[in-house]
């Protein structure tokens, strides 16, 4: 039976439960434990795949093709465990499972209720996702007091009652606001949040107190007194200048020791090694170079929509001790302009997206990068924009477009995928009348790279695997025509049916590469990702006037 750490949040949302949980997981992993993580989301959607990026932020994709909450991206960037569909559960999925069982007759005619049927299904999902690990962290989305969260909170209360404190620990993240007019921190919101939690039968073992500044010992004692939590388990989590400081900050206050002692893990752990995180902090604070990258997207007003892209760019800089400044630009705003907003950047990245809004701005961005010799990295929709630009402006295919945006295009160089293999090798089919949810090409897919290409050089091997999330693809009818005009097809699916990577010859452009996959989902601060590292290096070389640079490793 895997020991569980349940992470809840109070007072307000967006306090950083996911980062806090991932930081603790990183410490426990650094002490030699096999760790996994899980997110329980209280919304009714089956998954976030069809949710607006403006509301929900990024949809993170796992190896097995699950469309999940962006917190799973935090988890995978902080710990080495590769997560799956089991690690992201929503209210919608829980109810879907229960209703399916009821229709099959699994409940033998019983009246199906929240307790015990919904809570039992939640507990079953927790057991399934956490089995076989030394310890698991389970984050409950939302805020204590939300009506949507009640079934999840009741389920974890039951787990604690049955397993006891040595197999289930409650960690509550709360806000300790600083009131500038009074010049002091206020603990009352935390007291009320814990009171709310205790009213439903959950007594926190650990409090993580989020604040603008460190919570002084006097306030920690006060919080401990009013919440029935040990003073040493009231942990201060102030704002930090570098995210990678958090594991060291939590370890310095003994959080991992509290967990190890309560969950009886002492015989499994060794001394902690946080050198990787310390090196990341040092490389971030003491860069040797600096570049500016334009990210031209559709949802830039809500930067969480491109969370993994932003992190992967920073990881690419981290491996070279280079500070990466991000210039977020709305693609639609570039349409009809002279593209002056891109004049001062060292590299351009065009990330994924859906729908016709802003697509022409992405095409113009690709054209600008191609003609002005600016390093260009296109991802998913960014690759499709690059192909459309090349077809229109180099090959001369009038009206070239994606059928996603123009079904009547005379030259549909990007079209709907009607058949493909899933991450497990099964054949999937769809048409333009299929449901939007769960009908894309999703998950980890292998691709073969062409010898002598930039992509092959960056990856350093012939066959690579990347995660995908798309339903439109390069139209093979135009493959030969575009190749004859100079476009390099650098990567294809293993069955040779889908174009995965395109680039320009290096004698025509210093660094122009676009891929259909989402390599940002496999980038971590430990290793970065070869495409992002190569892109940042190209941006550095452009800034240095084309001079080849010595690689500097963090």
From Swiss-Prot:
Disulfide bonds: none annotated. ATP binds at residues 14-19, 71. L-glutamine binds at residues 353, 381-384, 404, 471. Residues 1-265 are annotated as: Amidoligase domain. Catalyzes the ATP-dependent amination of UTP to CTP with either L-glutamine or ammonia as the source of nitrogen. Regulates intracellular CTP levels through interactions with the four ribonucleotide triphosphates. CTP binds at residues 13, 146-148, 186-191, 222. Its EC number is 6.3.4.2. Residues 292-545 form the Glutamine amidotransferase type-1 domain. Keywords: ATP-binding, Glutamine amidotransferase, Ligase, Magnesium, Metal-binding, Nucleotide-binding, Pyrimidine biosynthesis. It comes from Stenotrophomonas maltophilia (strain R551-3). CTPSs have evolved a hybrid strategy for distinguishing between UTP and CTP. The overlapping regions of the product feedback inhibitory and substrate sites recognize a common feature in both compounds, the triphosphate moiety. To differentiate isosteric substrate and product pyrimidine rings, an additional pocket far from the expected kinase/ligase catalytic site, specifically recognizes the cytosine and ribose portions of the product inhibitor. Belongs to the CTP synthase family. Mg(2+) binds at residues 71, 139. Gene3D superfamilies: 3.40.50.880, P-loop containing nucleotide triphosphate hydrolases. The keyword Hydrolase does not apply. It catalyses: UTP + L-glutamine + ATP + H2O = CTP + L-glutamate + ADP + phosphate + 2 H(+); L-glutamine + H2O = L-glutamate + NH4(+); UTP + NH4(+) + ATP = CTP + ADP + phosphate + 2 H(+). Pathway: Pyrimidine metabolism; CTP biosynthesis via de novo pathway; CTP from UDP: step 2/2. It comes from the Bacteria. Allosterically activated by GTP, when glutamine is the substrate; GTP has no effect on the reaction when ammonia is the substrate. The allosteric effector GTP functions by stabilizing the protein conformation that binds the tetrahedral intermediate(s) formed during glutamine hydrolysis. Inhibited by the product CTP, via allosteric rather than competitive inhibition. UTP binds at residues 13, 186-191, 222. This is CTP synthase. One of its GO terms (molecular function) is identical protein binding. PANTHER family: CTP SYNTHASE, CTP SYNTHASE-RELATED.
